[in-house]
Amino acid sequence: MVIFLAYFLVVNESEAFFGHLFKLATKIIPSLFQRKKERSVMNRDLENLFDPYQRNLEMDRLLKQLRNY
């Protein structure tokens, strides 16, 4: 591994290689934090979806219309 890194430090292609690694890191690192945020929102939505005590406002509106007829 050390020989591999030393080779890339000497050769001109090292700039492109490390530039590519840096570009990948800047895309991957923010996506890791974004996934956690999306997961927490999804979990909260699922908890609200399966909460038996939550009122369904759309259903209430339809039932009120039904009573009027």
UniProtKB/Swiss-Prot annotation:
Its main location: secreted. It comes from the Eukaryota. Residues 1-16 form the signal peptide. GO terms for biological process: defense response to bacterium; defense response to fungus; killing of cells of another organism. It is found in: Secreted; Target cell membrane. The keyword Signal applies. Expressed by the venom gland. One of its GO terms (cellular component) is extracellular region. Residues 38-69 form a propeptide. The keyword Phosphoprotein does not apply. Keywords: Amidation, Antibiotic, Antimicrobial, Cleavage on pair of basic residues, Cytolysis, Fungicide, Hemolysis, Membrane, Secreted, Signal, Target cell membrane, Target membrane. Amphipathic and cationic peptide with an alpha-helical structure. Amphipathic peptide that exhibits extensive cytolytic activities against both prokaryotic and eukaryotic cells. Acts by fastly disrupting the bacterial membrane. Is more potent against Gram-positive bacteria than against Gram-negative bacteria, and fungi (LC=25.1-8.3 uM). Shows potent activity against penicillin (MIC=3.0 uM) and methicillin (MIC=1.5-3.0 uM) resistant bacteria. Is lethal to the fungus Beauveria sp (LC=1.9 uM), a highly lethal pathogenic fungus to insects and resistant to many AMPs. Belongs to the non-disulfide-bridged peptide (NDBP) superfamily. Medium-length antimicrobial peptide (group 3) family. This is Antimicrobial peptide Meucin-18.
